[in-house]
């Protein structure tokens, strides 16, 4: 029996892989309407179900794009993703709150970084407002600041709800999913690729492959001979502030340091009304290392951002591991990597924050890249 050959295989069922599958399901719907053959697709993951890692273990923030370095894929895809994520939530009835983000300095040297943030906002076409005492008191009464930047397009949703909604739609449309399946080898042949799964127990044949394996994307890339990227596992932990839902209305962020630390430890009013503080940035020695920080750092950061937090209010929440492309101490701000090698094998590497927000735009970008090849099917 000739083995089934798929038009497309997606490695990784985190938010980016799922979003590509969902967008493909929409393309297939249109193809059916005009009596064209559907694009066959399989999504493969080593875990037992979807979004087991960073995709469900993040702040759930719908970012505006103000933090991203201008003229990068990250900036472009985050700004576009912001608009698309709200549209998606509306289309699939996913709850969200578009409450804006207040970014405030917490030391004198932050003033220079405030002007850098303004510059980025203008360059990335993100609407913002410089706010002072009275306006801050209206937006976030407990914020400790006399000046800040307010970005109205930022919001919050539940990242797992988004992942599950797009997964359900993709599944409904006939896209196949294969869990508990780790890709351990890749053979290229004239019609595409053979993916070897779980110690040779299974194989999957596909014409085009997308590597969206998150933390393990560099290892999948190495199987194709693309060796120039290394993913550094960077833990982000969150504490929950109990019993004081009034402290934060939406999102309160520090002014970022524009380096390996990311956007900084921030306060998020989650959809259930609880407040999270995090994430920190702890570089791990391996991708499966278990680590837990002390509460001190979180209490200290919360106290710098708002009045009225006491140490007793904090309880440990959850953690996730980012797929970072720079090591600890780096001053670089790496861009998302979307690279094709060899032909028809596309790698998505270092898709960390704002990867969740950017995911619908990343999916569109990829499918545009493949549009001509998929139309031929």
Sequence positions of predicted segments:
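Short hydrophobic core segments
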Residues: 9-11, 204-216, 363
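Glycine-rich FAD pyrophosphate-binding loop
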Residues: 25-56
């Amino acid at each position: 029996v000739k083995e089934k050959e798929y038009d497309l295989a997606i490695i990784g069922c985190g938010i980016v892989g799922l979003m590509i599958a969902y967008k493909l399901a929409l393309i297939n719907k249109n193809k059916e309407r005009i009596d064209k053959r559907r694009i066959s697709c399989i999504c493969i993951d080593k875990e037992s179900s979807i979004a087991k890692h960073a995709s469900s273990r993040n702040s759930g923030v719908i970012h505006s794009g103000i933090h991203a370095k201008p003229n990068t894929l990250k900036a472009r895809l985050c700004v576009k993703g912001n608009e698309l994520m709200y549209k998606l939530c509306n289309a699939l009835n996913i709850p969200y709150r578009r409450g804006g983000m207040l970014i405030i300095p917490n030391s004198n040297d932050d003033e220079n970084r405030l002007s850098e943030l303004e510059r980025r906002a203008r360059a990335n076409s993100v609407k913002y407002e410089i706010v002072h005492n009275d306006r801050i008191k209206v937006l976030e009464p407990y914020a400790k600041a006399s000046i800040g930047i307010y970005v109205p397009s930022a919001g919050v949703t539940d990242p797992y709800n988004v992942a599950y909604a797009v997964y359900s739609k993709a599944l409904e449309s006939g896209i196949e999913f294969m869990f508990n399946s780790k890709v351990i080898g890749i053979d290229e042949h004239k019609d595409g690729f053979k993916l070897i799964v779980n110690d040779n127990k299974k194989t999957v044949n596909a014409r085009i492959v997308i590597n969206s394996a998150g933390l393990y994307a560099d290892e999948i890339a190495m199987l194709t001979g693309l060796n120039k990227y290394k993913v550094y596992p960077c833990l982000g932990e969150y504490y929950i502030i109990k019993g004081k839902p009034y402290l934060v209305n939406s999102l309160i962020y520090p002014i970022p340091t524009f380096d390996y630390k990311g956007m900084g430890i921030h306060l998020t009013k989650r959809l259930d009304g609880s407040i999270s503080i995090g994430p920190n940035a702890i570089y791990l020695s391996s991708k499966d290392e278990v680590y837990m920080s002390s509460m001190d750092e979180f209490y200290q950061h919360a106290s710098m951002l708002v009045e009225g937090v006491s140490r007793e209010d904090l309880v440990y929440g959850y953690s996730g591991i980012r797929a970072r492309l720079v090591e600890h101490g780096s001053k670089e701000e790496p861009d998302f990597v979307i690279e094709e090698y060899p032909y028809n094998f596309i790698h998505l590497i270092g898709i960390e924050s704002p990867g969740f927000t950017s995911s619908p735009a990343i999916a569109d970008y990829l499918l545009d890249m493949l549009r001509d090849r998929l139309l031929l099917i």
